[in-house]
Regions:
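Donor-nucleotide binding loops and adjacent catalytic segments primarily
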Residues: 2-82
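CheY-like receiver
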Residues: 79-82, 141-146
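Acidic/polar active-site rim loop that often engages polyanionic ligands
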Residues: 101-105, 124, 148-149
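Active-site-proximal loop->helix
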Residues: 110-133
Length: 183
C-alpha cells in the first residue's frame, strides 16, 4: 500500500448513505485492519457530517484512524493521488478519474438515483477487474472480504491515435502514410 489514507468522495450532490457507512465503527474498523490510518471525506451537499475526528480501533491490533472532511474542492486530483484507496460514488466521471490515476477504487452505487447507469458501469468495470463495486449496505463486507486491493487491474493508458486509425481504416486509407504526429 503506497498511502495509509482513504479518500471518500460523494461528488457534487449528496450521498448520506455512503457517508454514514464510512462513519460507522464497523467500516472504520475494516479500514484500520487494512492498514489505513486516515480517512478524508468529501461530503458534497449531504446532511450527515461525522461528529468525531478519530476512531480508536477495537481489534487485537488496536490503532487509530483520523477522520477529516470537507464539502467541496475545485479539484479532487490531489486527494485521489494522495490516497491508497478511494471509495467513491458510482459516477462515471469520478470512476474514470480515479482509474486513470491508478489508485485502487471501491465504487459505491447510489440506488436512489434515476436509472441504473452507475450499477451498469461499476458492474462491468468490476467484472473486468478494475475496481470493486458495491452498495452502501454491503461496503463493510466488501472491505473485509476483498483480496489485496493492489491486485486490481490498472486502467490501460489511452491510445491517442486510435480514433485516427479507425477513421483511416473506415475511409479506406489503411495504406496511407503515417501522420506527422505518428512519426
Amino acid at each position: 500500500m503506497t498511502s495509509n489514507t482513504v479518500f471518500v468522495t460523494v461528488g457534487t450532490t449528496s450521498f448520506d448513505a455512503l457517508v454514514r457507512v464510512i462513519d460507522s465503527d464497523a467500516c472504520l474498523e475494516a479500514l484500520l485492519r487494512r492498514g489505513f490510518r486516515r480517512v478524508v471525506i468529501q461530503l458534497g451537499t449531504g446532511t450527515h457530517v461525522p461528529a468525531r475526528d478519530a476512531y480508536a480501533g477495537e481489534g487485537a491490533g488496536g490503532g487509530r484512524i483520523a477522520i477529516e472532511h470537507f464539502r467541496h474542492s475545485p479539484s479532487l486530483a490531489q486527494h485521489i493521488a494522495d490516497a491508497g484507496l478511494v471509495i467513491s460514488h458510482g459516477g462515471a466521471g469520478t470512476i474514470m478519474e480515479v482509474l486513470r490515476a491508478r489508485t485502487p477504487l471501491v465504487a459505491v452505487i447510489n440506488g436512489k438515483l434515476m436509472g441504473n447507469h452507475q450499477a451498469e458501469l461499476g458492474g462491468e468495470l468490476a467484472a473486468r477487474g478494475h475496481l470493486i463495486c458495491t452498495t452502501p449496505k454491503k461496503l463493510v463486507s466488501a472491505l473485509q472480504s476483498a483480496d489485496d486491493l493492489a491486485s486490481l487491474l490498472p486502467w490501460p493508458d489511452a491510445d491517442e491515435d486510435a480514433f485516427g486509425r479507425l477513421c483511416d481504416e473506415e475511409m479506406g486509407f489503411a495504406g496511407a502514410p503515417a501522420r506527422p504526429h505518428d512519426e
